[in-house]
């Protein structure tokens, strides 16, 4: 199963990987355009299909005092400018039923947040908006249980669903990635494209802190392993100065390393997908 996102950008587990790349949260128009411009330059140079990602509201911050974003109205204006300036599709997350319709007027892909993927009303509203859907797998859910979320989307007429791994809870305050789950997600849902969110899989929490920590020094290790499985896309956040990012900086790739990082991802993806299919039973 392949999911067409925009002209020239289609996600499928046997196709060249799509980069869902950007920033964690919108900070300003100028900052967003600067970062997106770097992504566009690198992905076009390397020939990687690209979808820009960012959140207009981080509704699940650990602290009530943490920065949440620019809000829905300003966020949609920024996304519209990104599309007009660079001609790239956009993905963003929807947290409330009422947001689905206005977000769908601008965004090319609507995302179901991991913590909300069991909320039927939200899933149905996002699916009914008629755009491709990216479902973040909750940290507490097994890969095979995502079939129920896909079924909810299908029941209201939307079969353009992608599934995104972002790590599983491993005890308290830690995440691990089960690479075996990638194929399980695809096989139990009729071949839905599988996306790997390497950035958020690197999160780790300080039990006494008020924000998530991260392990960005290991992003290359985890991304190489995920791409080597043979998946539809990579979900990545980068920042010009991760230590000063407004959210999830400890897990973000330094933006100046984007080209070197993606060059390796493309080399691995090209190699794996040139190999003949070999079913082992």
Curated annotation (Swiss-Prot):
Gene name of the encoded protein: kdsA2
Statement: the UniProt record of this protein carries the keyword Nucleotide-binding: no
Lineage top rank: taxon: Bacteria
Positions in coiled-coil regions: none
EC number: 2.5.1.55
Name of the protein in question: 2-dehydro-3-deoxyphosphooctonate aldolase 2
Chemical reaction(s) catalysed: D-arabinose 5-phosphate + phosphoenolpyruvate + H2O = 3-deoxy-alpha-D-manno-2-octulosonate-8-phosphate + phosphate
Pathways involved: Carbohydrate biosynthesis; 3-deoxy-D-manno-octulosonate biosynthesis; 3-deoxy-D-manno-octulosonate from D-ribulose 5-phosphate: step 2/3; Bacterial outer membrane biogenesis; lipopolysaccharide biosynthesis
UniProt entry tagged with the keyword Cytoplasm: yes
């Amino acid at each position: 199963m392949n999911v067409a996102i925009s002209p020239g950008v289609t996600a499928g587990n046997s196709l060249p990987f799509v980069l869902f790349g950007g920033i964690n949260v919108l900070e300003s128009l100028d900052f967003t355009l600067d970062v997106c411009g770097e992504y566009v330059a690198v992905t076009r140079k390397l020939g990687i299909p690209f979808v820009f990602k960012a959140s207009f509201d981080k509704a699940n911050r650990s602290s009530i005092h943490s920065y949440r974003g620019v809000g829905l109205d300003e966020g949609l204006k920024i996304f519209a400018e990104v599309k007009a300036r660079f001609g790239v599709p956009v993905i963003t997350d929807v947290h409330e039923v009422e947001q689905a319709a206005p977000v769908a007027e601008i965004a090319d892909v609507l995302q179901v947040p991991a913590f909300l993927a069991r909320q039927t009303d939200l899933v149905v509203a996002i699916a009914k908006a008629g755009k491709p859907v990216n479902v973040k797998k909750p940290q507490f859910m097994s890969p095979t249980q995502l079939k129920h979320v896909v079924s909810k989307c299908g029941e209201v007429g939307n079969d353009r669903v992608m599934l995104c791994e972002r790590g599983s809870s491993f005890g308290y305050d830690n995440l691990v990635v089960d690479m075996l789950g990638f194929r399980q997600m695809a096989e139990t849902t009729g071949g839905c494209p599988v996306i790997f969110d390497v950035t958020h899989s690197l999160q780790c929490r300080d039990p006494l802190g008020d924000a998530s920590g991260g392990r960005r020094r290991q992003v290359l290790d985890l991304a190489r392993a995920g791409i080597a499985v043979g998946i539809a896309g990579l979900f990545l956040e980068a920042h010009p100065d991760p230590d000063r990012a407004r959210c999830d900086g400890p897990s973000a790739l330094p933006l100046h390393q984007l080209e070197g990082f993606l060059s390796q991802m493309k080399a691995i993806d090209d190699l794996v997908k040139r190999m003949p299919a070999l079913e082992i039973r």
